[in-house]
Amino acid sequence: RGIIKTFDTLDDFNAFQVYAPEYVFFDVLGDVVCGGFAVPIRQGYADEVVIVTSGEKMALYAAANIKKALDNFQERGYAKLRGIVLNCRNVPDEVAIVEDFVQRIGTEIIGVVPRDSDIQRAEEQNMTVVQMDSELPVSQTIIDIAKRIMVPVEEQKEGAV
């Protein structure tokens, strides 16, 4: 019910009309996939979905459930899966595991965020790592992923990224 209330509140304040954002990020916990995740998709708040996952079994299970939900919604013209961002947790063979996963579900890895202590250091300062120091290698990785998400898929295929 919390996610539904969130969108009702955004509607009450006409947030999307007032701010006209180009990108809106919904951070949905993996265990909310069934009910809550569907709200932004069914109500037209999302055109594309980027799943952030690790190579951990339960994270991939949640990602697979999101993909199944998107497949079910696809017939109705709702949001489609743009790809996967791998947020590394230092699982053995993690990149290979996620590469196999994306191949099985028919998508791609948009980018890989390495496990990096600078991220935790930034969190301790109540900042993102990019806010803390945009020149760090991990910050540059995140910026590159963001740029890739911002470029339409069609332009990427034409060699823009």
Each language-model region and where it sits:
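NTP-dependent small-molecule kinase module
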Residues: 112-117, 138, 144
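Conserved catalytic-core segment of NTP-binding enzymes
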Residues: 12-18, 22-23, 28-112, 121
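C-terminal boundary of histidine-terminating zinc-finger modules
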Residues: 125-139
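Generic structural signal for well-ordered alpha-helical scaffold segments
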Residues: 7-14, 71, 146, 150
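Iron-sulfur (Fe-S) cluster-binding modules
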Residues: 106, 153, 157-161
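P-loop/Walker-type NTP enzyme "switch/lid" segment
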Residues: 1-15, 123-124
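C-terminal alpha-helix
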Residues: 141-156
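Amphipathic alpha-helical transducer elements in NTP-driven molecular machines
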Residues: 3-7, 57-64, 95, 139-143
